[in-house]
C-alpha cells in the first residue's frame, strides 16, 4: 500500500480558517432553502401553465373577447389620470389680456371712409396701447376691404353664362343656395352666443328678442342672473398676468353651448373706440341674419271628437 501523507499542523490550521469563513455563507444558504415559499392552494394542488393555450374546439369567439377587452380611454379618464399623476399642475389660467382681445373682437370693425386709402393694421392698438400713434405702420400695408353687397357668387352664376351646360349650372346654383342657408344657420347661432354690438357697446337685439335665464356654473337657473363686472384694460406689463377677476365669468367647456350672458365692456374701452371711429366707418362684425321667428298661432282650435 502506498504511504498516505499525513496532514501537518499547518495544513489543519488553514482548513479550520477556511471552514470558519464559509460558515456564515453556508448558514445563509441553508436558511434560504429551509424557508417555505408561500403558495396559494390552487398553486399547490394544481399545475398551472405559465402561458394559456387555446385548445381546438374551445377557441374564444368575438363576443368572449369583448369581456377581456379594456374599455376605451375617454377624455375624462385621461384628465383624471393626469390629475392623479400631477396633482400640482392644474390647467393654465387665462391671462388678463385675453379678455381685452375678446372684448375688442366684439366691437364693430372700423374701415376708412375713403376706400383708396390702405387699411392701417395699427388701428386696434389705439385701444390698448397708450403710444400707438408713435408706432410705425405695418409693412406691407393691408389692402382696403371689398364690399360685395348683392354681387355675390350666386348672382354672378345666375346672370353670366359662364357655365354653358344647363344641368351643371343648375347643380352649382342648388349647391350655392344650400351653402348660403347653412351660413344663415351658423350666423344665427353666433348671434345667440355673442350678439353684435353698436358703437356704444350696446347689444343690437333682433326683433321679438327674449332674454334668457342665466345658467350658473353648476347648471342651476338663476332668475335675476349674476351681475358680471367688466374687465378693465390692462397695460403692457399686466397683459400676461392671470386674470384678477375671481368671479366665475369664464365658461367651462361643459357649458360652452349654454346661453351664458356676456361680460359688459369696459367704459374706457368704449370711450377709446368712439374716439377712434370719428373719421372712420364702423360696420358690424357680421350682418344681422335674415332669419325670422316662427309664427305662433293666435289661438289653438278645439278639436272635435273624431277630428284628426
From Swiss-Prot:
Tissue: Expressed in Testis.
Native source organism of the sequence: Mus musculus
Segments passing through the bilayer: none
Protein name: Testis-expressed protein 52
Pfam families (alphabetical): DUF4532
Domain of life the protein comes from: Eukaryota
Amino acid at each position: 500500500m502506498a504511504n498516505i501523507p499525513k496532514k501537518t499542523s499547518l495544513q489543519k490550521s488553514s482548513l479550520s480558517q477556511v471552514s470558519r469563513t464559509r460558515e456564515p455563507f453556508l448558514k445563509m444558504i441553508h436558511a434560504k432553502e429551509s424557508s417555505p415559499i408561500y403558495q396559494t392552494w390552487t398553486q399547490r394542488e394544481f399545475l398551472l401553465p405559465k402561458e394559456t393555450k387555446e385548445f381546438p374546439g374551445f377557441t374564444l369567439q368575438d363576443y368572449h373577447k369583448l369581456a377581456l377587452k379594456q374599455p376605451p380611454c375617454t377624455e375624462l379618464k385621461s384628465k383624471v389620470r393626469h390629475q392623479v399623476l400631477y396633482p400640482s399642475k392644474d390647467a393654465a389660467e387665462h391671462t388678463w389680456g385675453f379678455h381685452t382681445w375678446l372684448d375688442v373682437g366684439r366691437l364693430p370693425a372700423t374701415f376708412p371712409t375713403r376706400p383708396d386709402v390702405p387699411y392701417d393694421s395699427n388701428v386696434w392698438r389705439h385701444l390698448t396701447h397708450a403710444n400707438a400713434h408713435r408706432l410705425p405702420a405695418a409693412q406691407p400695408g393691408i389692402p382696403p376691404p371689398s364690399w360685395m353687397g348683392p354681387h355675390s357668387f350666386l348672382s354672378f352664376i345666375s346672370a353670366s353664362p359662364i357655365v354653358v351646360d344647363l344641368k351643371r349650372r343648375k347643380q352649382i346654383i342648388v349647391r350655392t343656395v344650400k351653402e348660403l342657408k347653412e351660413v344663415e344657420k351658423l350666423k344665427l347661432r353666433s348671434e345667440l352666443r355673442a350678439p353684435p354690438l353698436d358703437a356704444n357697446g350696446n347689444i343690437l337685439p333682433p326683433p321679438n328678442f327674449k332674454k334668457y335665464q342665466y345658467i350658473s356654473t353648476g347648471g342651476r337657473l338663476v332668475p335675476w342672473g349674476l351681475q358680471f363686472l367688466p374687465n378693465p384694460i390692462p397695460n403692457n406689463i399686466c397683459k400676461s398676468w392671470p386674470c384678477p377677476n375671481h368671479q366665475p365669468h369664464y365658461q367651462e367647456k361643459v357649458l360652452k353651448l349654454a346661453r351664458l350672458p356676456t361680460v359688459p365692456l369696459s367704459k374706457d374701452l368704449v370711450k377709446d373706440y368712439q374716439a377712434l371711429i370719428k373719421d372712420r366707418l364702423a360696420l358690424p362684425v357680421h350682418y344681422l341674419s335674415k332669419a325670422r321667428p316662427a309664427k305662433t298661432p293666435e289661438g289653438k282650435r278645439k278639436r272635435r271628437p273624431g277630428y284628426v
